[in-house]
A protein has these predicted regions:
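N-terminal alpha-helical scaffolding segments that mark the starts
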Residues: 1-103, 107, 111
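Short interface patches used for recognition in eukaryotic signaling and trafficking proteins
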Residues: 7-8, 230-234, 333-338, 355-360, ...
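Amphipathic alpha-helical interface elements that mediate macromolecular binding in regulatory proteins
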Residues: 19, 23, 42, 49, ...
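Ordered, helix-dominated protein-protein interaction surfaces in large eukaryotic regulatory proteins
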Residues: 27-30, 57, 177, 181, ...
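Short, flexible/disordered secondary-structure transition segments
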Residues: 32-39, 62-72, 94, 98, ...
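Accessory, localization, and substrate-recognition regions of eukaryotic RING-family E3 ligases
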Residues: 109-344
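RING-type zinc-finger domain of E3 ubiquitin ligases
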Residues: 342-405
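C-terminal flanking segment of RING-like E3 ligase catalytic modules
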Residues: 387-474
Length: 474
C-alpha cells in the first residue's frame, strides 16, 4: 500500500509546491507596483506575472497527464523540485529588497542608479529572466520536452545525450565530471568560475537549456573552455548579469574615449552576445552581432576601430588564437537522394523556397538548408521558426556547396582525417513548407556522377560582422 501511495504523495507535494510558488510570485507582484521600479528588460514587473502564468500552465498539464514520470533523477519531476525550490529562494531574496505590501515607502538606495541594492535587484531580475526562459524552453505550452530537447550546436547535443541520456538536469558536481571527459576543467577557482557562468539560474545544477546557452555563447565546440577562459575569465570587457541600463551607465564614464566597449550575454536573447560601445561622436550604442563566434566579432570590431578599449582600459587582449580555421565538415549526398531531386526537376544545391539561388545557410538546430536571401526575408517577417519544419531558429551557419566528380570524399590538399563523408537526410521540403513560387527556368540537370558537396564554413556568414544596432534593450 505504501508503494501504491508514493506516486500520489509526490503529486500532492508537487501541487502544493506549485501553489506556494504562484502565491509568492503574486505577492511579489504587489510589492513591485512602485513606478520607480520600472526598468528596461528584464523587468520584474513584467516577469513575475508571466512566470506565474507559465507555472499554472505546467501544473495544469501535469494534472491532466496523470502520474507523469516516476521521479527519476534528471526527469521532469526532479527538475520541478529543483526549480520550484530555487524559485522560492530567489523570490524571498527579492522580497527582502522591496518595501512590504501595503507600504509605499522604500529605502531610497533601492531607486538610486548604481547603488548596491539596485545592483542586487537588477541581478535578481536577470536570474528571474533566465528561469522564465528555462521553464518556457523545457515546458512549452506547459508540457515537458526536456527528454527530446535539441541543443543548437550538434557536438554539444551529441555530448549531452551520450553522457547524460534523457535527463534534462544534473547536479553540478556530476556535470563537471562528465564535461571533464572531453573538456578538462581545472579544479578550484577555475571550476567555480565555470559553474558561475553555466549555472544561469544559480540553482547548483546544470540544465540542458543552460548548457545549450553556454555552448552557443562560447562556440566553437573543439575549443569551448579555451574560448570561455579567454573571453569570460581573462577579458576585462566581459560583464556578467548586466542589464541594458547598467551597460549604458557603466559606459557613461568613457564617453570621452571612443572605442571603449564591454560585452555581456544578452538578457532577452539567450545564447547571443550584446556589445555596448562608445561611438566616435561620444554616444553609447548597443548591438547584438550576427551569429558567429564572439572572438571574430571583437577582432573585426577592433580592426574597424569600434572595439579598442575594453571597459575603458588601454590594453585590448589579442584573440587571434581563437580564430584558427576549423576543419570543414562534409556532407555526402547519396545517388538515391540525387535521383529524388532530379525526379522533381530540381537539384540539391538549389534553394527550395525561391528556386533561384543556391543554398548557402544551415539553420540550427534543425539543419535545414536554404539561401541567405530567403532566410533574411523570412525572418524579416518576424518569423523565428524554420520555414520547413517550424523548429525555432536558434542559430545559423554559412555553408558552401560545390560539385564533386567521382567517389572521393576529401579534397586533395590538407589532412583528410576529418573529411569523412556522411549521409545528408532528406526533408528539405516537408508538407508544412511554404509554397514555392512559379519557376520559368531551372538549371540543367547535373551529370549523374556529379555529386554536390557541402562545406560548413565557420565565421563566414554574409551579414555585417558587427550586426545591426539593436533598437530595443537586450
Amino acid at each position: 500500500m505504501a508503494v501504491a501511495l508514493a506516486p500520489r504523495g509526490r503529486q500532492w507535494e508537487e501541487a502544493r509546491a506549485f501553489e506556494r510558488a504562484v502565491k509568492l510570485l503574486q505577492r511579489l507582484e504587489e510589492q513591485c507596483r512602485d513606478p520607480r521600479l520600472s526598468m528596461s528588460p528584464p523587468s520584474l514587473r513584467d516577469l513575475l506575472p508571466r512566470t506565474a502564468q507559465l507555472l499554472q500552465e505546467v501544473a495544469q498539464a501535469r494534472r491532466a497527464g496523470g502520474r507523469g514520470d516516476p521521479g527519476d533523477p534528471g526527469g521532469s519531476g526532479n527538475f520541478l523540485v529543483i526549480y520550484l525550490a530555487n524559485l522560492e529562494a530567489k523570490s524571498r531574496q527579492v522580497a527582502e529588497l522591496l518595501p512590504p505590501r501595503g507600504r509605499r515607502s522604500a529605502n531610497d538606495e533601492l531607486f538610486r542608479e548604481g547603488s548596491r541594492l539596485r545592483r542586487q535587484l537588477a541581478k535578481l531580475a536577470v536570474i528571474f529572466s533566465h528561469m522564465h526562459a528555462e521553464l518556457q524552453a523545457l515546458f512549452p505550452g506547459g508540457r515537458y520536452c526536456g527528454h527530446v530537447y535539441q541543443l543548437t550546436k550538434a557536438p554539444a547535443h551529441v555530448f549531452w545525450r551520450e553522457r547524460c541520456g534523457a535527463r534534462c538536469v544534473l547536479p553540478w558536481a556530476e556535470f563537471e565530471s562528465l564535461l571533464g571527459t572531453c573538456h578538462p576543467v581545472e579544479p578550484g577557482c577555475m571550476a567555480l568560475a565555470l559553474r558561475t557562468t553555466i549555472d544561469l539560474t544559480c540553482s547548483g545544477h546544470v540544465s540542458i537549456f543552460e548548457f545549450d546557452v553556454f555552448t552557443r555563447l562560447f562556440q566553437p565546440w573543439p575549443t569551448l573552455l579555451k574560448n570561455w577562459q579567454l573571453l569570460a575569465v581573462n577579458h576585462p570587457g566581459y560583464m556578467a548579469f548586466l542589464t541594458y541600463d547598467e551597460v549604458q551607465e557603466r559606459l557613461q564614464a568613457y564617453t570621452d574615449k571612443p572605442g571603449s566597449y564591454i560585452f555581456r550575454p544578452s538578457c532577452t536573447r539567450l545564447g547571443q552576445w550584446a556589445i555596448g560601445y562608445v561611438s566616435s561622436d561620444g554616444s553609447i550604442l548597443q548591438t547584438i552581432p550576427a551569429n558567429k563566434p564572439l572572438s571574430q566579432v571583437l577582432l573585426k570590431g577592433q580592426k574597424d576601430g569600434f572595439y579598442l578599449y575594453p571597459d575603458g582600459k588601454n590594453h585590448n587582449p589579442d584573440l587571434t588564437e581563437l580564430c584558427q580555421a576549423e576543419p570543414q565538415q562534409r556532407i555526402h549526398v547519396s545517388e538515391e537522394q540525387l535521383q529524388l531531386y532530379w525526379a522533381m526537376d530540381s537539384t540539391f544545391e538549389l534553394c527550395k523556397i525561391c528556386a533561384e539561388s543556391n543554398k548557402d545557410v544551415k539553420i540550427e538546430p534543425c539543419g535545414h538548408l536554404l539561401c541567405s536571401r530567403c532566410l533574411a526575408a523570412w525572418q524579416h517577417s518576424d518569423s523565428q521558426t524554420c520555414p520547413f519544419c517550424r523548429c525555432e531558429i536558434k542559430g545559423r551557419e554559412a555553408v558552401s556547396i560545390y560539385q564533386f566528380h567521382g567517389q572521393a570524399t576529401a579534397e586533395d590538399s590538407g589532412d583528410g582525417s576529418h573529411q569523412e563523408g556522411r549521409e545528408l537526410e532528406l526533408g528539405q521540403v516537408p508538407l508544412s513548407a511554404p509554397p514555392l513560387p512559379p519557376r520559368s527556368e531551372l538549371p540543367p540537370r547535373k551529370a549523374k556522377n556529379a555529386q554536390p558537396k557541402v562545406r560548413f564554413l565557420k565565421g563566414n556568414f554574409p551579414p555585417a560582422a558587427l550586426g545591426a544596432q539593436d533598437p530595443t534593450p537586450a
